[in-house]
Amino acid sequence: MNPFTDYQVQFFERIKLKPRIIESLDDISEVLVACSKVFTFENLDIISNTQEALTRKVLIKQVLINKQGGLCYKANTLLYYFLLDFGLNVHQTRATCENQESHSRWNIGHGHMINILNFENKLYVMDVAFGCNLSLRPVPITDDGSEVIESCIGLYRVIKRENIVAGVYHYTHILEHRKPDTYLIESAKNWVIGYAFDPLLICKNDGDDDDDDNNNNNNTHQTQIQQLVIDDPNKDFCVKPLATKLINNTDNNNNNNSIATLTLNSFTLTNCKTGEKIKTNFDNDNLFEQFNQHLISIFNLPPLKIIPQIFLNQTSNFPINNLNS
């Protein structure tokens, strides 16, 4: 008898792990690492104006079947369903991210979806879609930040703070992160706020009370956050295309972890240990073709079929044979 649900088998196949029972923190960490190698943090459906209402079935279709990536509300939700099927005590909550470029303002209020794990009466944050700020292990939720998790990308901790106000939302904890000591940029080694959240706030999900998954609730938390991204006055994720993922690149027979980042007009590899960058700028008259080539070759994502307007705005010599083909 197969001990796994159809969804678990599908999820294991997508993250390229052999099916096994997930019951310990080490087991969960293996899943988080596998997710980081497969799931791309990207906003391409929003940029292409092809977004859908995000029910459980739609998320499965987009990310597991069609092998797309997505923002936090997609990857973290699929992880939630996967762990829930193993009987783990997990729920989702909504957070507010601090702007990761300036650290001078909050991003979209209540616009980040994370997972909270209650394991042996201790709470942990699990997040596989905070851009490429990935702990790759559950991060213990503590009052003083004394338990630090270190991954190849950086260090992570959770601290309790009294009455954190982010816009109109009030939270109780913050997740902080910094780069490793080997990083060449000194300022990046300072702790900064990633996001604020309340681990006891539970977000109910589509299909949670419906074993047959015939729920047609289109107003899910995931759909709500997606709409917040689209309507964001700061336009952090709704105008410029972005795809980023942790990758392993081989250099002189040594495996090095890098963050691959694809934008409208460039592709960048950032060394996780040192922060050193290798950047390739695209030819302005060939942006869309080069963008799609990198989606396929680096991120293993399907190419864009509809040309977003922002690409057309960048060049007057756009190849006719590429138009919305």
From Swiss-Prot:
Catalytic activity: an arylamine + acetyl-CoA = an N-acetylarylamine + CoA
InterPro entries to which the protein is assigned, alphabetical: Arylamine_N-AcTrfase, Arylamine_NAT_domain_sf, Papain-like_cys_pep_sf
Protein keywords: Acyltransferase, Transferase
Recorded GO MF terms: arylamine N-acetyltransferase activity
Tagged with keyword Cell inner membrane: no
Pfam families for this protein: Acetyltransf_2
Catalytic-site annotation from UniProt: C72 (acyl-thioester intermediate), H112, D127
EC numbers on record: 2.3.1.5
Family of this protein: Belongs to the arylamine N-acetyltransferase family.
Protein name per Swiss-Prot or TrEMBL: Probable arylamine N-acetyltransferase 1
SUPFAM superfamilies, A to Z: Cysteine proteinases
